[in-house]
Amino acid sequence: MCKVESPRSGVLLLRRIALERAERLLRLARTVYYEDPDRARRYVELARRIAMKARVKLPKHLKRSFCKRCNTPLIPGVTARVRLRQNRMPHVSVTCLECGYIYRYPYLREVKERRRRHMEGVKDRDAG
């Protein structure tokens, strides 16, 4: 029997290809930035456009690798300043050194996990 290809599988294939191309362009942008920053920005712009056109969500690690305002690849120490902040809500603060935009990524979940593990260790010592 002949297997009929559904239209859905074609869309999934296109989305997978689009994601691979976007990943490759973002990887290239990081390596090319040192020689030609404008080309790196163009690569990021193309990667974003490909992902949006194919309606593909970029994974979190890729989304956080470029500035959404100026399309510069965020390379810690070169194009970005990274700081840990311990305010009310602990977060990582990433500042784009090209345009000055500040990103804040909370890491409260990790703090709560560490605190819970610490409390379990204290209970074990008290019981033992």
From Swiss-Prot:
EC number, as in UniProt: 3.1.26.5
Reactions that this protein is recorded to catalyse: Endonucleolytic cleavage of RNA, removing 5'-extranucleotides from tRNA precursor
Keyword match Nuclease: yes
GO terms, biological process: tRNA 5'-leader removal
Keywords of this entry: Cytoplasm, Endonuclease, Hydrolase, Metal-binding, Nuclease, tRNA processing, Zinc
Source domain of life: Archaea
Job of this protein: Part of ribonuclease P, a protein complex that generates mature tRNA molecules by cleaving their 5'-ends.
Family in the record: Belongs to the eukaryotic/archaeal RNase P protein component 4 family.
This protein's name: Ribonuclease P protein component 4
Species, as recorded: Methanopyrus kandleri (strain AV19 / DSM 6324 / JCM 9639 / NBRC 100938)
Gene this protein is translated from: rnp4
